[in-house]
Amino acid sequence: MRDRRASYEYEDLLACGRGELFGPGNAQLPLPPMLMFDRIAEISETGGEHGKGLIRAELEVKPDLWFFGCHFKGDPVMPGCLGLDAMWQLVGFFLGWSGGIGPGRALGLGELKFSGQVQPNIKKVVYTIDIKRVMRSKLWLGIADGTLAADGEIFYRAKDLKVGLFKQTAAAQPAE
């Protein structure tokens, strides 16, 4: 049975990271510290710019977040790749939430533009993912556009984020 709520809190995201939300062997979020948002405030199959799905997630930015201490010493900034990874995480979550089977993997993107930096003085990051297409076959493939807004200002724009869910073969199953 899939969990199809319209929003998810932090404990739910951790359950997803443990493989408990969509079932064993299916889409999972990474666990902290690589989980890059605190909640999914909204998820739907019909919303968004293209009418094919919308996800809105939030991260409360705190000066003691793990990456500020090492990237960079004396000039703390969230690595851009982490914001991008959050967008891929959300597309994968959407595929699992939509009924897709198998573990997810980021497959690429068409274009990415940065116009700002997430620094410790930022209070909140909001990720918005607009689903453009979901292909359902042996491979479930999600294609989406995404933004990262910091305190209401868009800093990242990604086009054609691609994530796939792959049915595991016996050879790909983890050893017990």
Swiss-Prot record:
Homodimer. The gene is fabA. Pfam families: FabA. Its main location: cytoplasm. Its EC number is 4.2.1.59, 5.3.3.14. The keyword Lyase applies. GO terms for molecular function: (3R)-hydroxyacyl-[acyl-carrier-protein] dehydratase activity; trans-2-decenoyl-acyl-carrier-protein isomerase activity. Pathway: Lipid metabolism; fatty acid biosynthesis. InterPro entries: FabA, FabA_FabZ, HotDog_dom_sf. It catalyses: a (3R)-hydroxyacyl-[ACP] = a (2E)-enoyl-[ACP] + H2O; (3R)-hydroxydecanoyl-[ACP] = (2E)-decenoyl-[ACP] + H2O; (2E)-decenoyl-[ACP] = (3Z)-decenoyl-[ACP]. One of its GO terms (biological process) is unsaturated fatty acid biosynthetic process. It is found in: Cytoplasm. It comes from Rhodopseudomonas palustris (strain BisB18). This is 3-hydroxydecanoyl-[acyl-carrier-protein] dehydratase. Necessary for the introduction of cis unsaturation into fatty acids. Catalyzes the dehydration of (3R)-3-hydroxydecanoyl-ACP to E-(2)-decenoyl-ACP and then its isomerization to Z-(3)-decenoyl-ACP. Can catalyze the dehydratase reaction for beta-hydroxyacyl-ACPs with saturated chain lengths up to 16:0, being most active on intermediate chain length. It comes from the Bacteria. Keywords: Cytoplasm, Fatty acid biosynthesis, Fatty acid metabolism, Isomerase, Lipid biosynthesis, Lipid metabolism, Lyase. Belongs to the thioester dehydratase family. FabA subfamily. The keyword rRNA-binding does not apply. GO terms for cellular component: cytoplasm.
